[in-house]
Amino acid sequence: MVVKIGSSTVVGADGKVNRAFIGGLADQAAALRKLGWRLVVVSSGAIACGYPVLGFDRKPVGDLPSLQACASAGQCIISSAYDEEFHARDLLTSLVLLTRHDTARRTSYLHARDALLRLVELGVVPVVNENDTVTVDEIKFGDNDTLAALVSCLVSADLCVTLSDIDGLYTANPHEDPTAEFVPVVHKIDAKIIASAGDSSTSVGTGGMITKIRASRILMTAGIQSVICSGEEPDALVRLARGESVGTLFDPPAERLDIAPRKLWIALGDKAHGSVTVDDGAAKALVSHGSSLLAVGIREVDGQFAEGDVLDVCDPRGMVVARGIAEADSDVLELAAGRRQDQIASNRLLADLAEKPAIHRDNLIVFA
């Protein structure tokens, strides 16, 4: 089981670590072990508990060196809290700090996987966070919801649980709409589900419900169940392990249970360097038939990217339906966009795309 803990859950508004919460989490980890479960923790909070001890009265947004300094100081504080509380329950923790750079290359992605699996095998509870001390925008995961999805795929988790200040998904923002209804189970994440997420980011964190939904979509694609629930829910992890219903469950379809590891790396390892928008016919061919993406189906190209870079594939309504590795650079695909097959074949600059796909099906993962 992977559990992701948001900044506002593990760190109070005063910047102090919530030791009572971490102690309760350690109690649950000990109980889970007796039930045969192993736990990996993805914990935010380094910057949130670092800025007060460095003399800032608020998070220094926009000041990258100061944010990195806060992360460095805060990571020591929060790691010590985990170590002390878990050690008191005879559990050993370890610290794993990752950046997008560590997973963008498949070799280092696999090394990260092997290290995490070995730690779990040895009975250790890994505490994972993004290495905010060295990250810049180009190599950031951006939020720990995405990082938790990555870690869940790395260790082939049975369940990923997000403990937050939100008790689950609603049809609208319950703080603004009194008619909002709680959603106990989600079987498919569509545009309606994404629209209902809105924006619920907090003052101490970087995520919101929309980032949690996107992470859950990746997990559903990987065939991994995920849950969003409140960090104040008593014994949530133990109850989930026993099969109880807590929060909102994102339940993947059975046919998604055997995704090739390399395709999961495409979905998670590197960020998208650009995107292509395809017509409805191409989107249907990808989603329903597992086809390669042909250049003739591309309508728009966004961003600058090279052959071999990872791209998002969007349908005409802007929904990301797939991600894959480009067989041509952005200049070539932009030249091909909107052209008929005969026009592509007759253009000497596009001749290769008449013979090969823009993204081959073996290098393409379709999202659930």
Language-model segments: what does each one mean?
Residues 1-368:
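C-terminal catalytic "cap/lid" subdomain
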